[in-house]
Every structure is written in C-alpha cells, then in structure tokens.
A protein has these predicted regions:
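Glycine-centered, phosphate/nucleic-acid-interacting loop/turn motifs that mediate DNA/RNA or nucleotide
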Residues: 65-66
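A short acidic, leucine-rich amphipathic alpha-helix
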Residues: 42-46, 61
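Amphipathic alpha-helical dimerization/coiled-coil segments
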Residues: 88-120
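Key DNA-contact positions within bacterial/archaeal DNA-binding proteins
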Residues: 26, 52-53
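Short amphipathic alpha-helical elements of helix-turn-helix/winged-helix folds
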Residues: 30-35
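Short, cationic-aromatic polyanion-contact patches
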Residues: 15-24, 39, 72-94
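Short alpha-helical segments that sit at the start of domains
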Residues: 2-26
Length: 120
C-alpha cells in the first residue's frame, strides 16, 4: 500500500491551493518535500492524481527549472519510463513561491491605493 500524505502535507497542499495553485500542481510540489527522485507511478500513488495531471504538473516544474528528467528504457519494447529528480532543494522552491506571492500582494496594494486616490 503506497504511503499517502500526512495531515501536515495535506495542510501544505491546502495553503498552496489557497494561493490559486491548481490541485495537481500543489499535490505534486508537496510530494517532493519528502522525495527527491521518483517515477510517475510513484507520484500518482502517493498524491492520488491521474497520469495526465502528474504530467501537466511535471511540465510546469520542468519549465521552472525545478526538476530534471531522465528516460529509463526497459529493454527494447514499450515506452521508456521517465524518472524525475529535483534540480533545486524543496525549500528553495517554496521560498520562490513565497517571494512571488509577496510581489503579487505588493502590486495589489499599489493598485488598490491608486484606485482609492482616483475615487477621492
């Protein structure tokens, strides 16, 4: 039986989703808090996501430069298995997300102040 998320990990997922992050991406990011490398099936088992959801999340993480991929060929037949590995430490990923959210908040405050000034 695959290990599921702890209550702490589920809270992390909830907080990421509160920041308007898609569920699949939030669950995949939290998965990497305890796993530095894996294959898609392992992510699916632990996060309770389907393969297309995992693939979409992994594409985002790869575009950000947060993971590396490696194709593992199993013999001569069949599709290769993709192995994923963190390219940056998990805490760096989270700190980047926090900085981005702080920047959004700062930008929103400026816009709200501008709106307030225009209405006075």
């Amino acid at each position: 039986m695959p290990k599921r998320f702890t209550s702490k990990e589920e809270r992390m997922v909830g907080l990421l989703m509160d920041m308007a992050m898609p569920r699949s991406l939030a669950r995949t990011i939290v998965f990497f808090s305890k796993n530095e490398d894996c294959v898609c099936n392992h992510i699916q088992d632990v996060t309770d996501l389907r393969q297309p959801e995992v693939s979409t999340a992994m594409q985002y993480l790869k575009e950000r430069g947060w993971i590396m991929t490696e194709s593992l060929q199993q013999g001569r037949k069949g599709r290769p298995i993709i192995s994923y590995k963190l390219a940056v430490p998990f805490d760096k990923m989270i700190n980047t997300l926090i900085r981005e959210e702080h920047a959004k908040i700062k930008d929103l405050r400026v816009k709200l102040n501008n709106l307030k000034q225009l209405t006075q």
